[in-house]
Amino acid sequence: MIPRYSRPEMSAVWTEENKFGAYLKVEIEAAAAWSQLGVIPAEDVEKLRTKATFDVQRIYEIEKETRHDIVAFTRAVSESLGDEKKWVHYGLTSTDVVDTANGYLIKQANNILRKDLQRFIEILKKRAYEFKDTPCIGRTHGVHADITALGLKWALWFEEMRRNIERFEMAAADVESGKISGAVGNFATTPPFVQD
Protein backbone atom coordinates (compact mmCIF):
# COMPACT_ATOMS: atom_id res chain seq x y z
CA MET A 1 0.00 0.00 0.00
CA ILE A 2 1.10 3.56 -0.58
CA PRO A 3 2.06 4.79 2.92
CA ARG A 4 0.68 8.30 2.56
CA TYR A 5 -2.76 6.86 1.75
CA SER A 6 -2.88 4.26 4.49
CA ARG A 7 -2.64 4.03 8.23
CA PRO A 8 0.10 1.82 9.69
CA GLU A 9 -2.48 -0.60 11.12
CA MET A 10 -4.02 -1.20 7.68
CA SER A 11 -0.68 -1.25 5.87
CA ALA A 12 0.49 -3.97 8.26
CA VAL A 13 -2.30 -6.27 7.06
CA TRP A 14 -1.04 -6.11 3.47
CA THR A 15 2.67 -6.69 4.04
CA GLU A 16 4.39 -9.66 2.42
CA GLU A 17 5.26 -10.93 5.90
CA ASN A 18 1.59 -10.98 6.92
CA LYS A 19 0.52 -12.50 3.60
CA PHE A 20 2.94 -15.39 3.94
CA GLY A 21 1.97 -15.67 7.61
CA ALA A 22 -1.62 -16.15 6.46
CA TYR A 23 -0.46 -18.80 3.99
CA LEU A 24 1.28 -20.60 6.84
CA LYS A 25 -1.81 -20.39 9.04
CA VAL A 26 -3.88 -22.02 6.26
CA GLU A 27 -1.28 -24.76 5.80
CA ILE A 28 -1.18 -25.52 9.54
CA GLU A 29 -4.96 -25.46 10.03
CA ALA A 30 -5.43 -27.78 7.04
CA ALA A 31 -2.86 -30.16 8.55
CA ALA A 32 -4.73 -29.99 11.86
CA ALA A 33 -7.95 -31.00 10.09
CA TRP A 34 -6.14 -33.92 8.43
CA SER A 35 -4.91 -34.87 11.90
CA GLN A 36 -8.48 -34.98 13.20
CA LEU A 37 -9.20 -37.42 10.37
CA GLY A 38 -6.31 -39.58 11.57
CA VAL A 39 -4.10 -38.95 8.53
CA ILE A 40 -1.44 -36.68 10.03
CA PRO A 41 -0.03 -37.50 13.49
CA ALA A 42 -0.95 -34.89 16.10
CA GLU A 43 2.70 -34.55 17.16
CA ASP A 44 3.63 -33.58 13.60
CA VAL A 45 0.94 -30.90 13.57
CA GLU A 46 2.34 -29.58 16.85
CA LYS A 47 5.81 -29.44 15.27
CA LEU A 48 4.34 -27.51 12.34
CA ARG A 49 2.76 -25.06 14.77
CA THR A 50 5.93 -24.52 16.80
CA LYS A 51 8.73 -24.89 14.25
CA ALA A 52 7.41 -23.76 10.87
CA THR A 53 8.88 -20.42 9.85
CA PHE A 54 9.75 -18.60 6.66
CA ASP A 55 11.92 -15.78 5.41
CA VAL A 56 10.38 -13.53 2.77
CA GLN A 57 13.68 -12.99 0.97
CA ARG A 58 14.30 -16.74 0.89
CA ILE A 59 10.87 -17.27 -0.68
CA TYR A 60 11.79 -14.78 -3.42
CA GLU A 61 15.13 -16.51 -4.01
CA ILE A 62 13.41 -19.86 -4.45
CA GLU A 63 10.73 -18.29 -6.64
CA LYS A 64 13.40 -17.12 -9.09
CA GLU A 65 14.19 -20.80 -9.66
CA THR A 66 10.70 -22.30 -9.47
CA ARG A 67 8.77 -19.42 -11.02
CA HIS A 68 5.91 -20.43 -8.73
CA ASP A 69 5.07 -18.47 -5.59
CA ILE A 70 3.42 -21.26 -3.60
CA VAL A 71 6.09 -23.82 -4.46
CA ALA A 72 8.67 -21.28 -3.31
CA PHE A 73 6.71 -20.63 -0.11
CA THR A 74 6.28 -24.32 0.76
CA ARG A 75 9.95 -25.05 0.09
CA ALA A 76 11.05 -22.12 2.26
CA VAL A 77 8.80 -23.31 5.09
CA SER A 78 10.03 -26.89 4.67
CA GLU A 79 13.61 -25.70 5.21
CA SER A 80 12.66 -24.85 8.81
CA LEU A 81 11.27 -28.32 9.54
CA GLY A 82 12.37 -31.91 10.01
CA ASP A 83 10.51 -34.99 8.80
CA GLU A 84 7.17 -33.28 9.49
CA LYS A 85 7.79 -31.15 6.40
CA LYS A 86 6.13 -33.90 4.34
CA TRP A 87 2.77 -32.63 5.62
CA VAL A 88 3.23 -29.08 4.35
CA HIS A 89 0.70 -28.53 1.55
CA TYR A 90 -0.72 -32.04 2.03
CA GLY A 91 -3.89 -32.43 -0.07
CA LEU A 92 -3.87 -28.76 -1.03
CA THR A 93 -3.56 -26.83 -4.24
CA SER A 94 -2.19 -23.31 -4.61
CA THR A 95 -5.58 -21.64 -4.81
CA ASP A 96 -6.68 -23.41 -1.63
CA VAL A 97 -3.93 -21.58 0.19
CA VAL A 98 -4.06 -18.24 -1.65
CA ASP A 99 -7.85 -17.85 -1.71
CA THR A 100 -8.29 -18.87 1.92
CA ALA A 101 -5.40 -16.67 3.06
CA ASN A 102 -6.84 -13.74 1.10
CA GLY A 103 -10.17 -14.21 2.86
CA TYR A 104 -8.30 -14.15 6.17
CA LEU A 105 -6.39 -10.99 5.19
CA ILE A 106 -9.61 -9.29 4.11
CA LYS A 107 -11.11 -10.23 7.47
CA GLN A 108 -8.18 -8.55 9.22
CA ALA A 109 -8.72 -5.41 7.14
CA ASN A 110 -12.47 -5.51 7.73
CA ASN A 111 -11.91 -5.71 11.49
CA ILE A 112 -10.05 -2.40 11.27
CA LEU A 113 -12.86 -0.91 9.20
CA ARG A 114 -15.47 -2.24 11.65
CA LYS A 115 -13.87 -0.33 14.51
CA ASP A 116 -13.78 2.83 12.41
CA LEU A 117 -17.37 2.43 11.26
CA GLN A 118 -18.54 1.88 14.83
CA ARG A 119 -16.69 4.97 16.02
CA PHE A 120 -18.13 6.97 13.11
CA ILE A 121 -21.73 5.90 13.71
CA GLU A 122 -21.40 6.73 17.41
CA ILE A 123 -20.30 10.25 16.47
CA LEU A 124 -23.27 10.62 14.12
CA LYS A 125 -25.65 9.53 16.88
CA LYS A 126 -24.03 11.88 19.40
CA ARG A 127 -24.32 14.81 17.00
CA ALA A 128 -27.97 13.99 16.28
CA TYR A 129 -28.80 14.42 19.97
CA GLU A 130 -26.45 17.36 20.39
CA PHE A 131 -28.12 19.35 17.61
CA LYS A 132 -31.71 18.10 17.97
CA ASP A 133 -32.95 21.61 18.84
CA THR A 134 -30.66 23.53 16.48
CA PRO A 135 -32.62 25.00 13.59
CA CYS A 136 -31.25 24.99 10.07
CA ILE A 137 -32.52 25.62 6.60
CA GLY A 138 -34.04 22.61 4.92
CA ARG A 139 -33.64 22.15 1.20
CA THR A 140 -35.72 20.78 -1.60
CA HIS A 141 -34.45 20.48 -5.15
CA GLY A 142 -31.22 22.10 -3.95
CA VAL A 143 -32.82 25.35 -2.83
CA HIS A 144 -33.82 26.69 0.59
CA ALA A 145 -37.13 25.43 1.91
CA ASP A 146 -38.68 25.08 5.38
CA ILE A 147 -36.82 25.22 8.65
CA THR A 148 -35.72 21.84 9.99
CA ALA A 149 -33.45 20.62 12.78
CA LEU A 150 -29.75 20.05 12.25
CA GLY A 151 -30.10 17.08 14.60
CA LEU A 152 -32.56 15.52 12.16
CA LYS A 153 -29.95 15.74 9.40
CA TRP A 154 -27.42 14.02 11.65
CA ALA A 155 -30.04 11.37 12.55
CA LEU A 156 -30.70 10.71 8.86
CA TRP A 157 -26.97 10.35 8.21
CA PHE A 158 -26.80 7.99 11.19
CA GLU A 159 -29.61 5.83 9.82
CA GLU A 160 -28.09 5.78 6.34
CA MET A 161 -24.75 4.73 7.80
CA ARG A 162 -26.43 2.03 9.90
CA ARG A 163 -27.85 0.55 6.68
CA ASN A 164 -24.44 0.88 5.01
CA ILE A 165 -22.87 -1.08 7.87
CA GLU A 166 -25.48 -3.83 7.39
CA ARG A 167 -24.52 -4.00 3.70
CA PHE A 168 -20.84 -4.00 4.64
CA GLU A 169 -21.39 -6.97 6.98
CA MET A 170 -23.27 -8.90 4.29
CA ALA A 171 -20.44 -8.30 1.81
CA ALA A 172 -17.84 -9.15 4.47
CA ALA A 173 -19.51 -12.50 5.12
CA ASP A 174 -19.09 -13.31 1.44
CA VAL A 175 -15.41 -12.40 1.19
CA GLU A 176 -14.15 -13.46 4.63
CA SER A 177 -14.03 -17.06 3.52
CA GLY A 178 -11.92 -19.54 1.68
CA LYS A 179 -12.02 -22.92 0.09
CA ILE A 180 -9.96 -26.03 0.48
CA SER A 181 -11.07 -28.59 -2.05
CA GLY A 182 -7.93 -30.01 -3.62
CA ALA A 183 -6.26 -29.87 -6.99
CA VAL A 184 -9.25 -29.34 -9.26
CA GLY A 185 -11.70 -28.14 -6.64
CA ASN A 186 -13.87 -31.25 -6.56
CA PHE A 187 -12.86 -32.74 -3.17
CA ALA A 188 -11.55 -35.86 -4.96
CA THR A 189 -8.45 -36.05 -2.77
CA THR A 190 -9.38 -33.65 0.01
CA PRO A 191 -12.60 -34.25 1.96
CA PRO A 192 -14.91 -31.32 2.80
CA PHE A 193 -14.04 -31.76 6.50
CA VAL A 194 -10.61 -30.22 5.82
CA GLN A 195 -12.29 -27.11 4.44
CA ASP A 196 -14.86 -26.86 7.20
Predicted regions and their residues:
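A helix-coil-helix interface module used to build multimeric assemblies
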Residues: 1-196
